[in-house]
């Protein structure tokens, strides 16, 4: 369900991108094999802002990259919860995580 006020990562989308950039650890085996891809992760932002029910919605094509995407999602700090009619609500969220070698 979509909430009147969607959940937000602390500091907004810019901080989320910064968090991902600083916390994704590109697996060595993936680097050695030049594996790239985009893993689309789905998760629920709970009423208290915690992250739950994380799963891969669309695979990057590489299990190692998918596992790293999930790890970084599950380790995110609490979000500001979504709101509906003045109450905190659970909101499902999808986020693409890109793995690209420089």
Region locations from a protein language model:
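Intrinsic disorder and flexible coil segments
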Residues: 1, 45-48, 95
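Cyclic nucleotide-binding regulatory module and flanking cytosolic helices
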Residues: 1-14
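A short, well-structured alpha-helical segment
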Residues: 11-19, 35, 46, 50-81
């Amino acid at each position: 369900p979509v909430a009147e006020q969607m959940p937000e990562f602390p500091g907004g989308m810019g901080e989320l991108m910064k968090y991902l950039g600083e916390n994704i650890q590109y697996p060595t085996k993936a680097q050695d094999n030049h594996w790239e891809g985009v893993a689309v992760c789905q998760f629920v932002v709970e009423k208290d802002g915690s992250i739950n029910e994380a799963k891969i919605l669309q695979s990057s094509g590489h299990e190692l990259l998918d596992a790293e995407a999930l790890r970084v999602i599950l380790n995110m700090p609490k979000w500001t919860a979504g709101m509906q009619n003045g109450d905190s609500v659970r909101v499902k969220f999808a986020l693409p995580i890109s793995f690209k070698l420089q």
